[in-house]
Amino acid sequence: MFGRTHYCGEVTDMAIGQTVRLKGWVQKRRDLGGLIFIDLRDRTGIVQIVFSPDVSKEALQVAETIRSEYVLDVEGTVVQREEGQVNPNLPTGTIEVHAMHVTILSEAKTPPFLISDKTDVSEDVRLKYRYLDLRRPVMFQTFKMRHQVTKAIRDFLDEEGFLEVETPILTKSTPEGARDYLVPSRVHPGEFYALPQSPQIFKQLLMVAGFERYYQIARCFRDEDLRADRQPEFTQVDIETSFMSQDDILAMIERMMARVMKVAKGVDISIPFPRMSYDEAIARYGSDKPDTRFGLELVDLSEQVKDCGFKVFASAVQNGGQVKAINVKGAADKYSRKDIDALTEYVARYGAKGLAWLKVEADGLKGPIAKFFTEDEQKQMMQTLEAETGDLLLFVADKKSVVADALGALRLKLGKDLQLIDESAFHFLWITDWPLFEYDEEEGRYYAAHHPFTMPVREDVPKFETDPASVRAQAYDLVLNGYELGGGSLRIFERDIQEKMFKTLGFTEEQAREQFGFLLEAFEYGTPPHGGIALGLDRLVMLLAGRSNLRDTIAFPKTASASCLLTEAPSAVSEEQLEELHLRIKDVQKVD
């Protein structure tokens, strides 16, 4: 019953005259009165099946009962299509299969949406019937690419001498980073495991163990607010290695990405990738993950305007802030006052109090703020911004962080709106020279910019107590087309530096020992210098497959509210289960 000679999408002219046996789903059925045509679909494509009384009356009778999405077993002869019947849009469009036998393996209800790449249905419906959504060819191709990417990574790392090692899913909760997903212990009442946010500590312990080269296609879990490129459970390519410098690690990852791009996209990319310091990325692009496929770089005018007649600019600089601008080439006529008002509202979302603007005309700068600048100041501004007639100049004056956030976001919006981005290009970039700490003004304390195990630049260690904000990290992020693919660093491997790190982050000695004592003790048994990286597999596939949503690269994803519409998880559990776990649920309001 289950013998198959060909896949549907692979029946070609070479098979003309042969008897083939196919399996698949009914994509479309057409009854032309005496003849029935069925498009049979499997994961490789579609082939046309013809049911004719001249070939088999029995098969034709069965075909009369067939409907969309029925699963069929068809045996027939491959025939050249008649002239005028060729379908140039199908790889199998020059042939058809004349059915001699057909068996209905499974019937189907009418699906809630058309199984087609062009289907127009809400994402909620697609996620509720995900098993139907995954039948669409575009979805299968995405997951085929995911498989190719994962295999290319595994093959490369195997050739480089890495071992794939699985680390625990049930582990210890730590307060740093995002919220943990907690798992109550039945055996230890009142105590909890946490699902891992990453295998970070375990992979470092594998370096202490002498494994030297480790990797894992790791499942990770973070209970954080979601957006289009975030999921509560995700997959990362987790890599750790001993006795390699930062340059060694970056060069190896570049070779790995070149392999991935060749396998998955058939393109050769140039290595080494460009490198840019964190400070330079913020200064030029207003972002630590800049999209370098287009220009519109930020230009600092603070020094030029600190004494100008426009008080908004002058006071911003005098109060320790910045004035930066973007020159939107040739856009003066493309943006009306109403359009600029919309841009002003847009930057307000990022904290900007306003968006100043000028248009470059043949006789000089025109706009609401032009009158505040002398002729010499206008000339100097135009020279700095390389402004020409027809350009639109957009300014934000505020705290440095607000200027970066607002103009960085505006730059991306303008790039998309003006179609300045080459969507076929792949621009990889390393961001290096990160700060080790970030200061949270609301909580009045420092956080690790990456994580608490990142090695500082050695000469900066004495600044832990005197000037933490100036301590540099031996850390690096890999960026692709404006998305952070992942981050890594050299790791702390000496107990005294790790203890100083915990102290700067606000841990008491007792807290550090309680949460990380096993790691601190391990560092006393001969720890090699080591480092690594973690790359987001879901996000990498999203970019390579040209998908706009991370959920399209995960077989059974969660919604923005971290729920599964297919299984209706999360869900309530029985009182008996709660009793076993020694838990009681407080009165809570259900979140829609």
Swiss-Prot record:
Signal peptide: none annotated. Its EC number is 6.1.1.23. GO terms for molecular function: aspartate-tRNA ligase activity; aspartate-tRNA(Asn) ligase activity; ATP binding; catalytic activity, acting on a protein; nucleic acid binding; transferase activity. It is found in: Cytoplasm. InterPro entries: Aa-tRNA-synt_II (IPR004364), aa-tRNA-synth_II (IPR006195), aa-tRNA-synth_II/BPL/LPL (IPR045864), Asp-tRNA-ligase_1 (IPR004524), Asp-tRNA-ligase_1_N (IPR047089), Asp/Asn-tRNA-synth_IIb (IPR002312), AspRS_core (IPR047090), GAD-like_sf (IPR004115). The keyword Ligase applies. Its main location: cytoplasm. The keyword Aminoacyl-tRNA synthetase applies. It comes from the Bacteria. It catalyses: tRNA(Asx) + L-aspartate + ATP = L-aspartyl-tRNA(Asx) + AMP + diphosphate. ATP binds at residues 222-224, 231, 484, 536-539. GO terms for biological process: aspartyl-tRNA aminoacylation. Aspartyl-tRNA synthetase with relaxed tRNA specificity since it is able to aspartylate not only its cognate tRNA(Asp) but also tRNA(Asn). Reaction proceeds in two steps: L-aspartate is first activated by ATP to form Asp-AMP and then transferred to the acceptor end of tRNA(Asp/Asn). This is Aspartate--tRNA(Asp/Asn) ligase. It comes from Anoxybacillus flavithermus (strain DSM 21510 / WK1).
